[in-house]
């Protein structure tokens, strides 16, 4: 388990982010950057934990990302538009948050130096409708361009390419 690190978790107040924070917070300093749109953290006592700092903001704001990342050795980038209903109603925003948000995180990490590890969360959706027993090396498969539900998968696949290159 990771210990003694300062860790930025973008989207850290969401369902998975708050669960990850619960696992890391006892032995690390955790900075959460989140717009609190889906505030799963509110059902926990994390906000009161002395090792948690909440930066309320958006990954689309590069200066906020830079401020939140200051001094962090590890960055876990989870921020994205969540929920099929939200993605289908806001496909452009879904792409914007994924692509520009990830670019901001990657550029800030590169410019500040000292980042030991950057983890970019993706989704099994990049493997298509039947993502069963797939591995990261398997070919991706996306649906038809006209199907709005694939916006999320396309945006996450693009962020994978950004993070790996």
Predicted regions and their residues:
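Small-residue (primarily alanine) positions within well-ordered alpha-helices
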Residues: 12, 79-80, 109, 159
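A short helix->loop->beta-strand "cap" motif at the edges of active sites that frequently abuts
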Residues: 109-117
């Amino acid at each position: 388990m990771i210990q003694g690190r300062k860790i930025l978790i973008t989207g850290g107040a969401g369902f998975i982010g708050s669960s990850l924070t619960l696992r890391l917070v006892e032995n690390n300093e955790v900075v959460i950057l989140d717009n609190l749109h889906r505030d799963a953290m509110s059902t926990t006592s994390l906000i009161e934990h002395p090792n948690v700092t909440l930066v309320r903001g958006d990954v689309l704001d590069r200066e906020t990302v830079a401020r939140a990342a200051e001094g962090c050795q590890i960055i876990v980038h989870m921020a994205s538009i969540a929920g099929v209903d939200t993605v289908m109603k806001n496909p452009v925003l879904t792409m914007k948050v994924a692509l520009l948000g990830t670019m901001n995180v990657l550029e800030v990490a590169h410019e500040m130096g000292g980042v030991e590890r950057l983890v970019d969360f993706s989704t099994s959706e990049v493997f298509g409708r039947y993502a069963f027993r797939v591995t990261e090396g398997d070919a991706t498969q996306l649906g038809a361009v006209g199907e709005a539900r694939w916006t999320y998968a396309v945006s996450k696949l693009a962020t994978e390419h950004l993070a790996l290159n």
